[in-house]
Amino acid sequence: LGLDEVSSKHRSTGICFIGERHFREFLHNYFPAKKGPIVDIETNRVLGEHMGILYYTLGQRKGLGIGGIKGEGDATWFICKKDVEKNILYVTKGDFSSYLMSDECFISDVNWIGKRPEKEIPVQVKFRDRQKDNPCTLSFEGDEVHLRYNELVEAVTPGQFAVFYDDDGLLLGGGIIDRTFLKGR
């Protein structure tokens, strides 16, 4: 079939095959940077300045430029919220902060590999590459898929993809994460 070249490629080739460019540099060609504050979501204290809110993603911890803050010890900071209108990047300390967690999400623009399930079903879901399977219950609300996780999941990010598998690992479909919730909020 001539798929040898494709099958020997690495699993992930960066953002949609843009090649060996630096991500920020690539985006800067299309979206000019607008600097803004990096704010601790718990204290509302400004910790630093970001290089442009579109260059960051929820759950990101590297490249923030806010390490070594006096009085914060060895805290690792993670992006937990982006206010695009106000150009504020919010961060939280440490792994498994409640600001990074969710227990349900809604998926839009779903593509099914076969027939759409007719009722609620158990599924395994991946929210990012190389992530462990997340057992969830898949149901429907209008045209959207509603996923309720069996356990809390960290940094499920609107705009990214969720991919659903059955318990045997068979691909069912996937779509775009629209919004996430923790305990209904």
Report each predicted region and the residues it spans.
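Nucleotide-activated chemistry modules centered on ATP-dependent adenylation/adenylyltransferase
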Residues: 1-171, 175-184
